[in-house]
Swiss-Prot record:
<dbReference type="GO" id="GO:0005524">
    <property type="term" value="F:ATP binding"/>
</dbReference>
<keyword id="KW-0547">Nucleotide-binding</keyword>
<dbReference type="GO" id="GO:0006450">
    <property type="term" value="P:regulation of translational fidelity"/>
</dbReference>
<dbReference type="GO" id="GO:0070681">
    <property type="term" value="P:glutaminyl-tRNAGln biosynthesis via transamidation"/>
</dbReference>
<keyword id="KW-0436">Ligase</keyword>
<dbReference type="GO" id="GO:0006412">
    <property type="term" value="P:translation"/>
</dbReference>
<comment type="function">
    <text>Allows the formation of correctly charged Asn-tRNA(Asn) or Gln-tRNA(Gln) through the transamidation of misacylated Asp-tRNA(Asn) or Glu-tRNA(Gln) in organisms which lack either or both of asparaginyl-tRNA or glutaminyl-tRNA synthetases. The reaction takes place in the presence of glutamine and ATP through an activated phospho-Asp-tRNA(Asn) or phospho-Glu-tRNA(Gln).</text>
</comment>
<dbReference type="InterPro" id="IPR003837">
    <property type="entry name" value="GatC"/>
</dbReference>
<comment type="similarity">
    <text>Belongs to the GatC family.</text>
</comment>
<keyword id="KW-0648">Protein biosynthesis</keyword>
<protein>
    <recommendedName>
        <fullName>Aspartyl/glutamyl-tRNA(Asn/Gln) amidotransferase subunit C</fullName>
        <ecNumber>6.3.5.-</ecNumber>
    </recommendedName>
</protein>
<dbReference type="Pfam" id="PF02686">
    <property type="entry name" value="GatC"/>
</dbReference>
<comment type="subunit">
    <text>Heterotrimer of A, B and C subunits.</text>
</comment>
<dbReference type="InterPro" id="IPR036113">
    <property type="entry name" value="Asp/Glu-ADT_sf_sub_c"/>
</dbReference>
<dbReference type="GO" id="GO:0050567">
    <property type="term" value="F:glutaminyl-tRNA synthase (glutamine-hydrolyzing) activity"/>
</dbReference>
<dbReference type="GO" id="GO:0050566">
    <property type="term" value="F:asparaginyl-tRNA synthase (glutamine-hydrolyzing) activity"/>
</dbReference>
<keyword id="KW-0067">ATP-binding</keyword>
Length: 100
């Protein structure tokens, strides 16, 4: 059984820059002990007959197959553009010439 001291709780609170009351220190002490005991339970669980996994759920790739498809015609893509040049969208520059 894990035992957390008041000094450890106060040190953790200090590291987190928290000011906690005596009641909060006691509550946090009990909470941390509970968490550490649960972690110890998990650590000591017999998993010798359990197959290792990388994911909790047995998921397969659910994405569709990647297939090239015909895009929209250039004229249609540029139809509502305010300014075009050489078959491309023309937008205001966001960099100075010196930045390029």
């Amino acid at each position: 059984m894990a035992k957390v001291t008041r000094e450890e709780v106060e040190h953790i609170a200090n590291l987190a820059r928290l000011q906690i009351t005596e009641d909060e220190t006691t509550e946090m002490q009990n909470t941390l002990e509970s968490i550490l005991n649960f972690a110890n339970q998990i650590d000591t669980a017999d998993t010798s007959e359990i197959e290792p996994t990388y994911h909790v759920l047995d998921l397969q790739n659910v994405l569709r197959e990647d297939k090239a498809i015909e895009g929209i015609p250039q004229e249609l893509a540029l139809k509502n553009a305010k300014v075009t040049e050489d078959g491309q969208f023309k937008v205001p520059s966001i960099m100075n010439e010196e930045d390029a």
